[in-house]
Amino acid sequence: MASTDKPDPEAIKSEVPQPPPPAPLRRDYFAVDVGLRVFLFATTLTAIVVMSTAKQTELAPVPGVPGLRVPVEAKFNHSPAFIYFVAALSVACLYSIITTLASLGVIAKPIYATKFLFYYALWDVLMLGIVAAATGAAGGVAYIGLKGNSHTRWTKICNVYDTFCKHVGSALAISLAASVVLVLLIMLSVCSLYSRVRRAE
């Protein structure tokens, strides 16, 4: 005689394997992230200040009038590339402040860690493109000021405006450091996401 016992639904539910809980994200990832973003803020702010204070006045000869020299000022806002440099790094500086505060919030509430890592990876790449483009544009103008261009008859100016060129060169070097920091932040976000996915499998 066939059994009329029906399987217990609760027993069936208990036998179904439950999906693994989401892997917890180690907080030291975001501790390093905060440190790098603070350093990004410091480098971008320093580059902005150094470039904005690039200013020098020297006596320059007047073409066609021998012996006559007039004061000529060199400032960063005389070049669109340098203006773009300051604007781009100002955006990156503001971005570093916002993301630093966001990372501190994630350390306090790690439940949103994965979403923030994904958004960080996207926005950091965008910010790296902005900073790198600004550094390249300003670097091209600075190189002409340092070496000149005989083919287009653009004369060099750094032999006259030495302090101005030192400010520009220092700002470019600091912005390169900011670009490296952004690369490290992108690598950190991607590696953190990859590690989290591997632990969740």
Curated annotation (Swiss-Prot):
It is a multi-pass membrane protein. Residues 1-13 have a biased composition (Basic and acidic residues). The keyword Glycoprotein does not apply. Residues 51-80, 146-167 are extracellular. Keywords: Cell membrane, Membrane, Transmembrane, Transmembrane helix. The keyword GTP-binding does not apply. It comes from the Eukaryota. The chain crosses the membrane at residues 30-50, 81-101, 125-145, 168-188. Residues 1-29, 102-124, 189-201 are cytoplasmic. It is found in: Cell membrane. GO terms for cellular component: plasma membrane. Residues 1-22 are annotated as: Disordered. Homodimer and heterodimers. Belongs to the Casparian strip membrane proteins (CASP) family. This is CASP-like protein 1D1. The lineage of its organism: Eukaryota, Viridiplantae, Streptophyta, Embryophyta, Tracheophyta.
